[in-house]
From Swiss-Prot:
One of the Pfam families matching this protein, by short name: Ribosomal_S15
Functional note: One of the primary rRNA binding proteins, it binds directly to 16S rRNA where it helps nucleate assembly of the platform of the 30S subunit by binding and bridging several RNA helices of the 16S rRNA. Forms an intersubunit bridge (bridge B4) with the 23S rRNA of the 50S subunit in the ribosome.
GO cellular component: cytosolic small ribosomal subunit
Annotated S-S bridges: none
Source organism superkingdom: Bacteria
Phylogenetic placement of the source organism: Bacteria, Pseudomonadati, Spirochaetota, Spirochaetia, Leptospirales
Sorted UniProt keywords: Ribonucleoprotein, Ribosomal protein, RNA-binding, rRNA-binding
Family: Belongs to the universal ribosomal protein uS15 family.
PANTHER family in alphabetical order: RIBOSOMAL PROTEIN S15, BACTERIAL AND ORGANELLAR, SMALL RIBOSOMAL SUBUNIT PROTEIN US15M
Stated name of the protein: Small ribosomal subunit protein uS15
GO terms of biological process kind: translation
GO MF annotation terms: rRNA binding; structural constituent of ribosome
Organism, as annotated: Leptospira biflexa serovar Patoc (strain Patoc 1 / ATCC 23582 / Paris)
Gene3D superfamilies attached to this UniProt entry: 6.10.250.3130, S15/NS1, RNA-binding
Protein encoded by which gene: rpsO
């Protein structure tokens, strides 16, 4: 679970303005943080299939947002991939 402070830090790091929560970069970074938290959860709870379905939905949402960002702003896409350490 992401705390309020962690969320604000992610928004400050990836957003263009202090309250920029809707840009693709911020949405991708927030999803990435939630995905990392859930993968840690699954190391201890291997049979939690209900949450695994939510994880798959988040991964697909992140994938579609990354594709959108790549189409619309390639330079921002490359910077974000490098900052988050994604394999692309």
């Amino acid at each position: 679970m992401i705390t309020k402070e962690q969320k604000q830090q992610i928004i400050a790091t990836f957003g263009s303005k202090p309250n920029d929560t809707g840009s693709a970069e911020v949405q991708i970074a927030l999803l990435d943080s939630r995905i990392k938290d859930l993968t840690e959860h699954f190391k201890a709870n291997k049979k939690d299939f209900h949450s695994r379905r939510g994880l798959i939905a988040m991964v697909n949402q992140r994938k579609s947002l990354l594709e959108y960002l790549k189409r619309s702003n390639l330079e921002s896409y490359k910077k974000l991939i490098e900052k988050l350490g994604l394999r692309k």
